[in-house]
Curated annotation (Swiss-Prot):
Name this protein carries in UniProt: tRNA sulfurtransferase
Residue numbers annotated as active site: 457 (cysteine persulfide intermediate)
Species this chain originates from: Pseudomonas aeruginosa (strain UCBPP-PA14)
Superkingdom of the source species: Bacteria
Localization (cell): Cytoplasm
Domain named THUMP: residues: 63-167
UniProt EC number: 2.8.1.4
Keywords linked to the UniProt accession: ATP-binding, Cytoplasm, Disulfide bond, Nucleotide-binding, Redox-active center, RNA-binding, Thiamine biosynthesis, Transferase, tRNA-binding
Length: 484
């Protein structure tokens, strides 16, 4: 299979040195993204497009390659093509007929040709010759250049002919690694996950910092969605996940700060801590999922007061987005279900929050706060690479594993719905229920408490994590299913 990758349009207007640097970075990223699927993958080209060639013939692996490329920043679109040496017009006609002849009977069509290089003919001459030949030989209803039912597309590059089989959309943006790096304040909800996606799509390596306000389930959920975002949109780069224990900080605010200023104070403490993390990691900006007046702390006066605690640039990609648009985007990128089942703690911190915070007043409230508490939180922060975050968490957990399902036991497939669809878990004589990992904690209580449940995932890591959490919650009827 050969693919021709067309770069994001804004890359093409850059200066020659910048353009070449971006293309080289994109080629490097494509190799990194597809390396595990084909170690012999070839990526060539350095100007306005890249040619990707693989010898893989397995249809499932090819589909996975295409899916990964559609989620790789820097790509405008890419083409599946069949490559041939460039022959005469009759040879071009024969190649197009071989690929499109069966589709043309009784239908209108158009021929589109693009060329690069010097030739003794024009693109229009190719289109006319091939179009008339296909109409004559394939029983087409006619030629329609405006709204054809079938498009016969090709590209001619020097002495090579590419007949285009299919076009796939790209993510756009710049290649990850070509721009600066940022730190995303991640709560795991709709807003922060979409904000992270927007930054990654634009081409910025996005690291994650999570402020744990007092819930192991919340931390696990945020780790899972951060891992998902990295795996789907940022896997070409090394990304960090930093978790900062903020329970003491919340306790200090609840006991020392006036109710109306609790929310603003909490956000200021988060920005202070995030700025310290960003400074240590030499990151260029902070990213939040805030939108104007979506909640009380996000009014302009409050945001202004919040930002005063840091000199680090704070980016808010969703600042004028409507909530429904954010939810729709989350659904499109695959984070909506994570967000829907994510525990939320921030909203309970203040009963009557101010929408017009005054700098002098918030400074007065913060004077009561023991900053040593914030320092301790930063000292206790943990840092992992996001690709290993789930595996490392599950390594030392002691959970009973079984290799055989006993009569009456139910196997719960907690894999992502995409994995469940691609490879359904079928066990003869065994009841299997699909309940994705991001929903298992919130929905397990709905299941029959008198039955025994075995959690299943491919590697056993995610199932061990969630079984351990459910056991800690008091559910004694859960184990891990690890078939031999």
């Amino acid at each position: 299979m050969k693919l021709i990758v067309k770069t994001f349009q804004e890359i093409t207007i850059k200066s020659r040195p910048v353009r070449k640097r971006f293309i080289r970075q994109l080629a490097k990223n494509i190799r990194a993204v597809l390396r595990d699927l084909d170690p012999e993958l070839k990526v060539e080209g350095e100007w306005d497009n890249l040619e990707v060639e693989t010898a893989v013939v397995d249809a499932k692996v090819r589909r996975e390659m295409i899916e990964r490329l559609t989620c790789t920043p820097g790509i405008g679109h890419f083409l599946e093509v069949h490559e041939y040496p460039l022959g005469d017009f009759d040879d071009i006609l024969a190649k197009c007929k071989a690929h499109f002849g069966d589709q043309l009977a009784g239908k209108t069509f158009a021929v589109r040709c693009k060329r690069a290089g010097k030739h003794a003919f024009t693109s229009m001459e190719v289109e006319r010759y091939v179009g008339s030949g296909l109409r004559r030989e394939c029983g087409a209803a006619g030629i329609d250049l405006k709204q054809p039912e079938v498009e016969v597309r090709m590209e001619i590059r020097l002495d090579r002919l590419f007949v285009i089989h299919r076009q796939h959309p790209g993510l756009g943006g710049y290649p990850l690694g070509a721009l600066e790096q940022v730190l995303v304040l991640m709560s795991g909800g709709f807003d922060s996950t979409v904000a992270a996606y927007q930054m990654m799509r634009r081409g910025m390596i996005s690291h994650f910092v999570f402020f744990n306000l007092g819930g192991r389930a919340h931390e696990l959920g945020v780790m899972e969605v951060a891992h998902y975002l990295w795996e789907k949109y940022g896997r070409s780069q090394r990304v960090l996940f930093i978790s900062v224990p903020f329970e003491e900080v919340v306790g200090e605010i609840l006991t020392k700060v006036d109710d109306s200023y609790m929310g603003v104070t909490l956000k200021r403490m988060m920005l202070r801590a995030a700025s310290r993390v960003a400074e240590r990691l030499e990151l260029d900006a902070l990213v939040t999922g805030e939108a104007i007046s979506q909640v009380s702390s996000q009014t302009l006066p409050n945001l202004s007061v919040i930002d005063r605690v840091t000199d680090t640039l704070v980016l808010r990609p969703l600042i004028v987005s409507h909530k429904q648009d954010i939810i729709d985007t989350a659904r499109q990128i695959g984070t909506a279900e994570f967000a829907r089942h994510m525990p939320e703690y921030c909203g309970v911190i203040s009963v009557n929050p101010t929408t017009q915070a005054k700098p002098y007043r918030v400074e007065h409230e913060e004077s009561k706060f023991d900053m040593a508490v914030l320092e301790r939180a930063l000292e206790r922060a943990t840092q992992r690479t996001v690709d290993r975050v789930i595996d490392e968490l599950g390594q030392d957990l002691q959970v009973e594993e079984v290799g055989e399902v006993l009569p009456g036991q139910i196997v719960i497939d907690i894999r992502h719905p995409d994995a469940q669809e691609d490879e359904p878990l079928a066990l003869e004589g065994v009841e299997v229920q699909a309940l994705p990992f991001y929903a298992i904690n919130s929905r397990f209580k709905e299941l029959d408490a008198n039955r025994q449940y075995l959690l299943y995932c491919d590697k056993g890591v995610m199932s061990r994590l969630h079984a351990h959490h459910l056991l800690n919650e008091g559910h004694t009827n859960v184990r891990v299913y690890r078939p031999a």
